[in-house]
Amino acid sequence: AKSQNICVFIIGHITKEGSIAGPRVLEHMVDVVLYFEGDASRELRILRGFKNRFGSTSEVGIFEMSQQGLVSANEVSSKFFTRGGAMSGSAFTIIMEGSRALSIEIQALVCESAYPKRSSTGFERNRLDMLLALLERKLEIPLGHYDVFINVSGGVKISETAADLAVIAAIISSFKNRPISKDSIFIGELSLNGEIREIFNLDQRLKEAKTQKFKNAIIPNKPLDTQGLKCFYAKDI
């Protein structure tokens, strides 16, 4: 195939751990490894690169199933959340998928329980445990006797830390049963001492926020261009 300049697709299946089943030689013999991710109950699919000998693996493709088959998704952010009335336990953030900025809704449910448990869908469980420990230590919020459930809307899996502040906001909102304005976004990474750290591509994220008609931004550092948003700068929680 190589001598004839023919492209060959090798399709395999994935184990429960998320790796390619079978011997590793399958990965080594090819130039590109792509994972097609997505919940079967949702229309969106994400094509993500894990190996590319000829370019970057940081880019993603987002597709949706339509009557014409699988097509490239337009206005992607609007498919990951809905801007209805304000409800407790909901906060918005902007994440980066490759070079794309996406508006994402973080949903939290906190309820008292005799046998508390934590569950996270689309957000790393270990990072959730760290954020809950920060809330107990720094803000003295007694979450030890509460169930905490986190969900990232749209079936997105967050692989960066810029959503930390939004997760914290959603948890506090649910715990106090006080809604957060749908016009606000939260962008920031939290350190172990509660400091809110600067994040990359802030200007691009704020540009996406303006596109989605957000009005307020809670961020850790001053951007080059606020994009007309009212920015609040937070150094720690």
Task: Set out the residue ranges of the language-model regions.
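Peripheral, non-AAA+ core regions of ATP-driven protein-machinery
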Residues: 1-24, 28-237
